[in-house]
Curated annotation (Swiss-Prot):
Catalytic activity: 2 oxidized [2Fe-2S]-[ferredoxin] + pyruvate + CoA = 2 reduced [2Fe-2S]-[ferredoxin] + acetyl-CoA + CO2 + H(+)
Listed name of the protein: Pyruvate synthase subunit PorB
Subunit structure of this chain's protein: Heterotetramer of one alpha, one beta, one delta and one gamma chain.
Source lineage: Archaea, Methanobacteriati, Methanobacteriota, Stenosarchaea group, Methanomicrobia
Gene3D superfamilies given in the database record: 3.40.50.970
Keyword annotations from UniProtKB, A to Z: 4Fe-4S, Iron, Iron-sulfur, Metal-binding, Oxidoreductase
Cofactor binding note: Binds 1 [4Fe-4S] cluster per subunit.
PANTHER family reported in the protein's UniProt record: PYRUVATE SYNTHASE SUBUNIT PORB
Note: It also catalyzes the oxidation of 2-oxobutyrate.
Alphabetized GO MF terms: 4 iron, 4 sulfur cluster binding; metal ion binding; pyruvate synthase activity; thiamine pyrophosphate binding
EC number: 1.2.7.1
Amino acid sequence: MSKTAPKTYITSGHSGCAGCCDAFAAKFTLMGAGPNTIVINPTGCLEVMSTPFPYSSWQVPWIHSLFENAGAVASGVEAALKALGKKDDVKVVSIGGDGSTMDIGLGALSGAFERGHDFTYVCMDNEAYMNTGVQRSSGTPFDASTTTTPAGKVSFGNPRPKKNMPAIMAAHGSPYVATTSIGFPRDMIRKVKKATEIVGPTYIHAQAPCPTGWGFDTSKTLEIAKLAVETCLWPMYEMENGEITQVRKVKNPRPVEEYLRAQKRFKHLFTMEGGEEEIKKIQAIADWNIKHFELQ
């Protein structure tokens, strides 16, 4: 990548929270995709904070889709561009949160990938429904406390493992699937650029820590994102035609306790009886990632 940073096409002045992860994710996505891009953005934090009527922070064509149909709208945009003979000159990128991607909009997204539409989908995974009050999604990690899975006398928080969305999208026959993190801007920009240059449905899954929903200082967003990677709870890799082709190595993984202790959504693990055993379970997830993805 050039030492000169590519131009971004989303402006300041939006109403995102201090330290907003979605602002970073949108910025890096457009730095990778470039100016000749049409964005489809389902309902969520990014849509709400970037387009308060009658204003917009977007400097590229932007479409607000429903929570559930970003994949269908992207399919229609791509088909229309093909019919007009303009698809080779314009990139179609959908940017959605984990709720619209992994839950509410999964059916439409699956259909778009199964049909082979030529577009890139970027999931900004802040691991809960932040826009509506920090409710659990299928992207919420094990033992995280949310407003619908609160930690208490009978629960350590979310009882279910995080859905493996990259594997699901790879199973659709996608030519390119990658994970990344807003804590590594160059990595995210490079992967988005690569994804948008490949013909066919491509998928980027980016972790995007939310200070409001996760409970950490607003100045620590990128630091927390890096810590997720350094503890191996967020492996970064690329898959081409279903095969892992590149992995970001972690030479000296840090204990997951450092990552968990930095967030209020996991604070109960350090105060409740039995919390130590739960931390060991989360460490086992990181250890599995190290072995499965060959992170060392």
